Amino acid sequence: MDRGEKERGAAGMTIVRKAVRSARLQVRPDGSLRVVAPPSFDVEGFVQRNAAWIEERRRDLDRLAAEGRGREGMLLLSGRFYHLVPGARFAVDDARGTVASPSVPALQRNLSRMLKEEVSGRLEACPDLAGRWSGRIAVKVQRTRWGSCSTLGNLNFNLRVIALPEPLREYVVVHEAAHLRELNHSERFWRLVGEHYPDHRAAEAELRRYWVIIERNRVWSEF
């Protein structure tokens, strides 16, 4: 796959030059710009022509990220912000609002373990979706999606899922488990999801909001 050539643009902008028919503009969750354009395309003019749209998009992202503003240096876990403190072992103290860990790698390992155990339990609780499922569960650090289901029936979950409130974690598991029966996003798939999580449209909107918050969080960016 041709990934194109990257070049530096103005501050907060990445330009990717590749053989495409038309330019594409993306405002990332952190507010920076990514432009994919043909080799000789006038990127600066393109950005200027879309300045109003860019500012509107940035305002939308700022609104979505409002809950995390001023708490970017705290760990978002189970929908709550915790102060990270050094400790000989991993420990969550809800009363004090702290999470102790000896290192970032240790923190990542323990969060991964927590999520994997929770996913296993949730799959056991919905046998009509998982059925006689014999695939594997993997927890990974991903930058584009909350989870995925392979054609072999293996379920992959983004470590970021553990940052979500409990109802949204449930929804992500239901969503991916439904793919064990429907490997698409067809009407049948959404009907199946709705049988187990009726308010899935609201959940999708909340997932978008939390994605922006996590993208702007310095602790999560270390994983």
PLM features: residue spans?
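Active-site-proximal or metal-binding-adjacent scaffold patches in catalytic folds
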Residues: 1-171, 180-223
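Walker B catalytic acidic pair
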Residues: 176
